[in-house]
């Protein structure tokens, strides 16, 4: 599983601010916060790409990568934790801002596929 990442894409009318807000939210979610602090995972933003690696306009996505130090991280558990974190962020955004928050798609991706 060390060659798989977790990709998060916000769909619909998501803004760069939404992507950054979600990343900040995830960085404070337990146990992701602990895994980040211990260097077992990394979270980064990057331009969204299609399956063939070509850029998809100006949209951004978030990628969570398990590092070699985090090789013992159980990938499916991490994937479910990220999904719960995205749901919690959407619930919070709905409570503090007008309008429906963008949908989030969380999926595993092979590292070499982008």
Please report, for each region that a protein language model flagged, where it lies by residue.
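Short amphipathic alpha-helical segments that predominantly mediate membrane engagement
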Residues: 1-64, 78-114
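Short, glycine/alanine-rich hydrophobic alpha-helices that insert into or span membranes
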Residues: 65-76
């Amino acid at each position: 599983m060390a060659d798989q990442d977790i990709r998060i894409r916000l769909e619909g009318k998501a803004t760069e601010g939404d992507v950054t807000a979600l990343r900040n939210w995830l960085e404070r979610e337990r146990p992701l916060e602990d895994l980040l602090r211990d260097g077992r995972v990394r979270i980064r933003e990057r331009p969204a790409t299609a399956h063939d690696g070509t850029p998809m306009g100006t949209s951004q996505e978030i990628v969570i990568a398990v590092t070699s130090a985090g090789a013992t991280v159980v990938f499916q558990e991490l994937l479910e934790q990220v999904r719960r974190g995205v749901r919690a962020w959407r619930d919070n955004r709905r409570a503090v801002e007008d309008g429906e928050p963008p949908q989030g798609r969380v999926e595993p991706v092979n590292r070499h596929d982008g």
